[in-house]
């Protein structure tokens, strides 16, 4: 059975990217209870075998989504004929240097689409899976979670290096890639092209509205109850939503709150969710680079944080949503257009993990820096912080 409404992708979780709303209100009861999922209670410790399988799923599993990317969007044809490595790197695709033969980059033509086909054949393009026949034609092309939620360390050259799973690919221009499809109408292509690098709208193919989100990190999730900006469900809920409705995977997903009920036989998604979650839970938030934080200033900032921010950014997870709290957009001072499209109609306080790494901030990327975030909440929450206190608070946030 095919999914007729899927036209895009993204990945998993959609967790947050910065300081989220501070306030004390909760949404009505009917919007606070996440839909039940197949997700079992989290284990205290996942086995090495399960985490290893989860890594495989995260990096290489398409869930059968070739039915979208190949059969419907025909992007296999576009990549084979028109996408050379230089173009691929410009739209944010990454290359895993660990699978490249020594010296290969010095020997190949980075302006030839045939080189892209060769890289796909070596399984070197992060987040893409391709079947290449004996005549070097791409017969099947699909995407994986890693497309949006992995990057590389640029150790070979920009866009080519060692994998960094869980790091959001803020260079990836998802919309521009989708817009390469020869089957899309011009007005649809214009919407996709408007999103820009590092953003994606995981509901556009459901409601026809466009309010793209910043691609979130997939690390630091182990103590976080709900993984989306609007807290509609736990990690396996969102993984299933994206795998089925966005990536085009052949699996089951149902949420009556959103009017979605998709089933496939066989279901290629549900059985893989526990291992995928185990791998995501194993990915720690990256510490700030050595020497990048002034410890004395950060300690002053911690005192300010404890006084002004910790009522919402509570505990090790940094979110009061673990206790069920959501915040109406009016309390946050951020745009409510995206929340209005969701089941909860509200925003979750975002966990503060690895903030130094993933600017811009807020769900829509409207704050370019942590200083902008602090200034925003100083104004909205009337905190009365001096410029020096704001700088101290920023330094503390960089340390998380």
Model-found features: residue ranges?
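Bacterial N-terminal signal peptides that target proteins for export
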Residues: 1-10
């Amino acid at each position: 059975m095919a999914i007729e409404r899927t036209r895009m992708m993204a990945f998993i979780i959609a967790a947050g990217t910065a300081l989220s709303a501070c306030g004390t209100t909760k949404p009505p009861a009917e919007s606070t209870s996440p839909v039940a999922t197949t997700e079992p209670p989290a284990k205290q410790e996942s086995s090495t075998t399960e985490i290893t399988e989860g890594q495989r799923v995260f990096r290489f599993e398409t869930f059968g989504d070739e039915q979208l990317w190949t059969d419907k969007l025909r992007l296999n044809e576009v990549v084979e004929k028109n996408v050379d490595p230089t173009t691929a790197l410009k739209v944010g695709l990454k290359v895993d240097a660990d699978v490249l033969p020594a010296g290969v980059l010095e020997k190949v033509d980075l302006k030839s689409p045939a080189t892209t086909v060769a890289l796909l054949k070596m399984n070197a393009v992060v987040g893409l899976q391709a079947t290449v026949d004996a005549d070097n034609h791409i017969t099947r092309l699909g995407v994986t979670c890693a497309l949006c939620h992995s990057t590389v360390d640029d150790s070979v050259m920009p866009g080519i290096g060692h994998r960094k799973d869980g790091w959001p690919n803020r260079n990836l221009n998802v919309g521009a890639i989708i817009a390469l499809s020869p089957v899309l109408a011009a007005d649809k292509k214009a919407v996709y092209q408007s999103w820009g690098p590092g953003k994606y709208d995981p509901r556009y193919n459901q409601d026809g509205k466009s309010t793209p989100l910043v691609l979130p990190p997939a690390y630091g999730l182990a103590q976080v109850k709900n993984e989306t900006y609007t807290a509609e469900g736990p990690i396996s809920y969102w993984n299933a939503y994206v795998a089925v409705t966005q990536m085009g995977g052949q699996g089951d997903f149902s949420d009556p709150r959103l009017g979605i009920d998709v089933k496939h036989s066989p279901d290629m998604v549900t059985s893989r969710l526990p291992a995928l979650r185990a791998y995501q839970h194993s990915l720690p938030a990256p510490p700030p680079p050595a020497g990048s934080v002034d410890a004395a200033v950060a300690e002053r900032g911690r005192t300010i944080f404890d006084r002004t921010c910790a009522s919402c950014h509570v505990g090790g997870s940094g979110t009061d949503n673990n206790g069920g709290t959501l915040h109406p957009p009016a309390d946050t001072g951020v745009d409510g257009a995206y929340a209005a499209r969701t089941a909860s109609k509200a925003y979750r306080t975002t966990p503060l993990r690895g903030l130094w790494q993933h600017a811009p901030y807020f769900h829509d990327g409207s704050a370019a820096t942590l200083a902008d975030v602090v200034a925003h909440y100083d104004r909205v929450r009337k905190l009365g912080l001096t410029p020096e206190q704001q700088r101290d608070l920023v330094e503390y946030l960089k340390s998380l």
